[in-house]
Amino acid sequence: MNGNIISFFIDSSTKYEDRIVYFRQISEFLSGLECNYPFFNEWLDKVYHELSQGKRTVIILVDKPSCKIIGLAILKDSIQEKKICTLRVAASHQHQGCGSYLIEQSIRLLKDPKPLITVSEEHVDAFKPLFRRFGFKIEDRVKSV
């Protein structure tokens, strides 16, 4: 990652007003994924509510010059599962270490060296090099709803 990228995370300790602003930007950054994930908008609403309940954390990467989100990881941290629900890096910043950084930070925050990670079938091949780097293996495939 280059020096023009800053990272931070939002969780239940983030001020309500800031969560609203960040979530608008997150929603915009993730737009376009609706076609790969059934009930995507409903899921995103659920993530927002669980964020305020302390069940989710979002790691965000921002390009300083443009002030735009260029990457994020949405985490679910519960007794039942430690999970990277969403991992996305803008095409303009792929192959620059952003995805690796997000996984490293996810592992640190989840306190689990091998958290569950879900990826749509359409994107599995794109993630293979990153998964190999961290020793992730395909454990299961779930057919879309």
Per-region residue spans from a language model:
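Active-site rim helix/loop that mediates acceptor-substrate recognition in acyltransferases
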Residues: 31-65
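Conserved GNAT acetyl-CoA-binding A-motif
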Residues: 110-122
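Conserved acetyl-CoA-binding loop-helix of GNAT-fold acetyltransferases
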Residues: 89, 95-109
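Short amphipathic alpha-helix that is part of the acyltransferase structural core
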Residues: 1-44
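Glycine-rich phosphate/pyrophosphate-binding loop shared by adenosine-nucleotide-utilizing enzymes
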Residues: 66-72, 82
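Conserved acetyl-CoA binding element of GNAT-fold acetyltransferases
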Residues: 76, 80-91
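Conserved active-site alpha-helix within GNAT-family acetyltransferase domains
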Residues: 121-144
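Acidic/histidine-enriched, beta-strand-rich ligand/metal-binding domains
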Residues: 39, 85-86, 94, 126
